[in-house]
């Protein structure tokens, strides 16, 4: 790192603070962990108070317009802060900066931003900082050739859960999705690098590992090593000390019987599967370029439940895709009832630049909102019934943090990803404990320590 070893800036960062705001998915969260490590390695310390920070960074998401608009608003709110203290450094990174449309908005309308870099340029941050400090002029790096498939240090959100990237990018080109443009085409990391990273995490006391990829099921497809995702998952599950193993996200078209077998045969692989549906209509699924139909999706869900009793299935659902009719929407509701999802991430369709769907005429906002409301009215009772099944049962819970509303209550997750509230001492955070479930809502279950 040129900046760290530069005599001029040797002690520059000792009393400096940084603040990171992250939008979007787990991969963005993990990228922020990597950025955090780099900044602290330079000498920065973290602060949750943006006004108190010397270095302010926004790690962006472009999947939906809402996150994009939030970013513009929050950056604009810093103009006065930057005017009052020009030495503050403001940076914007992530998926938005990989696309020319969003990047140009920042470049032209937000002069307060000093450093711009993309998803493939995180390791270059020290050099970008050095260049900015030397010239005082805006620095931009969104080049495509900076990715190294090596072990990368990062600051995890805690000392018992960690994300591990197994691949980058996506080759599916769903008609509504900008990820192939913002994250690039699929690249799989070498299995040996992934195994080494997990082994190091376990040595340092981490209990739960989550493997990350835009579509983990296509891991290894274009690589010179002959390892599939089920094979990689099994290798990871065999690492001594891995108490819980998760992964996300899986494309339904690539879900194999072999993957189901691996989950079934390895007790430390969590009984939770995120299977994005998006729509229950064959016509809309075809328009979305999802490459599966309603019956194929239902069969995948049925097989998961049949082979792995008690498995929890979550999904993603988009309402209001431009070609969706009321009949199509009813097909989506039908799948929700037949599968009985444990939870769902629901979204109103958001047109993204340079995607095929963005060229289509949108559905009236009132119709979309009405369908969205009816979707939630259908899902919430299903969630409630699924959670009610836990009452009276003893479950293992990895305690993660204090409740925001009551410091005497800790929150954690079951292996089925149920959010659990339990009265317990904060010294138990990071431990897996047994909890007897006594109550539930549509979104949580609660109980007592056993």
Describe the residue ranges of each PLM region:
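Short acidic/polar active-site loop segments enriched in Thr and Asp
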Residues: 207, 243, 342
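Flexible glycine/acidic-rich beta-alpha junction loops that bind and position SAM and/or redox cofactors
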Residues: 97-102, 213-222, 255-258, 277-288, ...
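Radical SAM/AdoMet-radical enzyme domain recognition
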Residues: 203, 230-231, 238-239, 244, ...
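Proteins enriched for Cys/Gly/acidic motifs involved in redox and nucleic-acid/cofactor modification
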Residues: 1-219, 228, 269, 273, ...
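Conserved, mostly hydrophobic/aromatic
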Residues: 174, 194, 211, 247, ...
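Short, electropositive alpha-helical surface patch
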Residues: 224-234, 257-271, 324-341, 366-369, ...
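Terminal RNA-binding accessory module
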Residues: 351, 358-450
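Conserved glycine-rich "GG(E/T)P / GGGxP" loop and the immediately following alpha-helix
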Residues: 62-67, 206-231, 235, 239, ...
């Amino acid at each position: 790192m040129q900046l760290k070893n530069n005599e001029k800036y040797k002690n520059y960062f000792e009393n400096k603070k940084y603040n990171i705001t992250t939008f979007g998915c787990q991969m963005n969260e993990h990228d922020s962990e990597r950025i955090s490590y780099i900044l602290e390695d330079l000498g920065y310390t973290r602060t949750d108070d943006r006004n108190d920070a010397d270095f302010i960074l926004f790690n962006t998401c472009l999947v939906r317009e809402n996150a994009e608009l939030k970013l513009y608003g929050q950056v604009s709110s810093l103009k006065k802060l930057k005017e009052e203290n020009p030495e503050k450094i403001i940076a914007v990174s992530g998926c938005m900066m990989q696309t020319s449309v969003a990047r140009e908005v920042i470049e032209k309308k937000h002069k307060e931003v000093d450093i711009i870099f993309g998803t493939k340029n995180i390791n270059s941050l020290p050099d970008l900082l050095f260049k900015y400090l030397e010239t005082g002029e805006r620095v931009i790096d969104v080049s495509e050739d900076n990715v190294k498939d090596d072990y990368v240090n990062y600051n995890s959100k805690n000392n018992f859960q960690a994300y591990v990237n197994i691949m980058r990018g996506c080759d599916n080109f769903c008609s509504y999705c900008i990820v192939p443009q913002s994250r690039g085409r699929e690249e799989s990391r070498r299995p040996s690098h992934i195994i080494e990273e997990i082994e190091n995490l376990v040595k340092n006391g981490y209990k739960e590992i989550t493997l990350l990829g835009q579509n983990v099921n296509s891991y290894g497809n274009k690589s010179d090593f002959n390892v599939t995702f089920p094979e990689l998952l099994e290798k990871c599950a065999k690492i001594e000390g891995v108490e819980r193993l998760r992964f996300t996200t899986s494309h339904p078209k690539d879900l194999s019987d072999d993957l189901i077998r691996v989950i079934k045969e390895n007790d430390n692989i969590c009984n939770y599967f995120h299977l994005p549906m998006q729509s229950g209509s064959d016509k809309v699924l075809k328009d979305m370029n999802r490459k599966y139909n309603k019956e194929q999706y239902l069969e995948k869900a049925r097989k998961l439940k049949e082979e792995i009793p008690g498995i929890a299935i979550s999904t993603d659902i988009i309402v209001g895709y431009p070609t969706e009719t009321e009949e199509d929407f009813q097909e989506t509701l039908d799948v929700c009832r037949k599968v009985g999802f444990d939870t769902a991430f629901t979204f109103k369709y958001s047109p993204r630049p340079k995607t095929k769907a963005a060229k289509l005429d949108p559905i009236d906002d009132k119709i979309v909102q009405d369908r969205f409301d009816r979707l939630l009215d259908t899902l919430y009772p299903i969630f409630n019934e699924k959670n009610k099944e836990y009452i009276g049962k003893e479950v293992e819970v990895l305690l993660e943090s204090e409740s925001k509303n009551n410091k005497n209550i800790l929150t954690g997750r079951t292996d089925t990803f149920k959010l659990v509230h339990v009265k317990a001492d904060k010294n138990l955070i990071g431990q897996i404990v047994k909890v007897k479930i006594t109550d539930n809502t549509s979104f949580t279950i609660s109980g007592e320590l056993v």
